[in-house]
Amino acid sequence: MINETVLLDAGTVGIALRLDEQKRIRHVLLSHLHHDHIQGLPTLADNLADDIDDPVALTSIPQVLKGLQTYVFNDTIYPDFLKLPDPQHPVFVCRALEIGRESEVDGLRVTAIPVNHLVPTVGFLIR
């Protein structure tokens, strides 16, 4: 957790944070799609699905967000929490960041910086 509402990657969110802490999350900054960085998202979604007012923003570069839609939340591996519990009130929404451009994320200034890795990956400059 960066603060009480912004999470950096989601590897262990479902087991490392208490349910009341998970319910405060409004944004998840995702660096890349490797399993150890996203494996907690389905558990987080399941924990929030029945008691969520506003969706949690999954925030990253377009390649990461597209990969989540194609390979993770595809109703084959996991339910599509980008459309559940219903399309008008999903658990998650995707928010794309442009590399090198500063964006506001819940009061923080976040810039995605490219990182040399095996898959499309960014680090985050957070102010």
Task: Kindly label every feature range from the protein language model.
Residues 1-127:
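Binuclear metal-dependent hydrolase catalytic cores
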